[in-house]
Design a protein with these regions (language model features):
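Nucleotide-sugar donor-binding catalytic core of glycosyltransferases
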Residues: 2-239, 279-289
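Residues at or immediately preceding the N-termini of alpha-helices
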Residues: 185, 246-249, 263, 283
Length: 299
């Protein structure tokens, strides 16, 4: 299968997590048969037009290691054209590219809202079944996954726990940069790795790269209001402990770790979450699922 992956070129919005994570996975799976067009410079470690410190999340996790470039960017014998951000950031269809798709034009919808803007598409904030719309979500590169280690825990929750997860205000958009605690990505991961729990919650949408980073760090993810998330919406079928109140959270913290030692219930959940991450939540498996759907729907 050969794909042209149409990218967003707005220099002020280069690190769209859905676009970047899927491109990472597709390149890993398809290699030279996934051509980013135009070439997505930040994926290759080129931040000359979009400085890393100005990117969403400072490029942590998804831009740690440059992806390998393709050897041939000739746009021919193409099966699919996929728009990496659908119609966000002013992206419009390119008729001269669309006509190259022998098997169809698809869209990757990373909008935080549940509205369907173009089909056929893959959508992370999918609230109910819709014709020609298929669930997807963020992913994290396999190289970012740390070993599980229960012996190095020194704190209950991570320093970067969002205020809303502890029943404070929901802080979104550029204002959320005030919540960035670490300048160094490894320090960010080490903090989660040394925490018994990683608290998370809904942001602009239900899916958040934070979920995957907590899982990758080897901390036990606790998800505020996960039981209220629509089933088809990412992260789908994630094993986790959820809580709806401050008392729920206190009860979980005291029940799962006793005298600074993990209970069997805690241990079992951490390993279940790691299995989910490896089978459902990496950039590679997200890309594999996308390719499977394309082949099933267009035979």
């Amino acid at each position: 299968m050969k794909i042209i992956y149409v990218t967003n070129q707005d220099p002020n919005s280069q690190c769209d997590y859905q676009e970047v994570s899927m491109l990472h996975g597709l390149r890993e799976v398809l290699g030279d048969d996934c051509i980013d067009y135009p070439r997505k410079k930040i994926m290759y470690g080129d931040f000359s037009e979009s400085p890393k410190k100005e990117l969403h999340g400072w490029g942590f996790s998804l831009l740690t290691e440059p992806i390998q470039d393709v050897k041939n960017r000739q746009l021919c014998e193409v099966d699919f054209v996929i728009y990496g951000v659908t119609d966000a950031y002013g992206v419009k269809n390119l008729p001269e590219v669309d006509k190259l798709a022998e098997r169809g034009v698809w869209y990757l919808d990373g909008h935080d809202h549940s509205k369907i803007t173009k089909t056929p598409c893959f959508k992370r904030e999918l609230f109910e079944p819709h014709e020609n719309v298929f669930p997807t979500g963020f992913g994290i590169p396999e190289h970012r996954i740390m070993p599980i280690d229960f012996s190095n825990k020194v704190q209950i929750i991570q320093k970067t726990a969002p205020p809303y997860a502890t029943f404070g205000p929901q802080i979104l958009g550029p204002t959320a940069r005030q919540l960035y605690v670490f300048n160094n990505e490894q320090d960010y991961y080490d903090d989660m790795n040394r925490s018994w729990f990683g608290l998370t919650c809904m942001k602009g949408g239900w899916d958040s790269l934070r979920h995957y980073e907590i899982l990758a760090s080897g901390s036990c993810l606790l998800f505020r209001d996960y039981d209220r998330k629509p089933k088809l919406c990412a992260p789908q079928d994630l094993p986790c402990f959820f809580y709806n109140s401050a008392q729920d959270l206190r009860d979980l913290l005291s029940r799962l770790v006793v005298d600074n030692k993990p209970t069997q219930e805690y241990i079992d959940m951490v390993y279940a979450q790691r299995e989910w991450l490896l089978t459902c939540g990496t950039t590679k498996v997200r890309a594999i699922k996308l390719i499977e759907v394309l082949n099933e729907q267009v035979s």
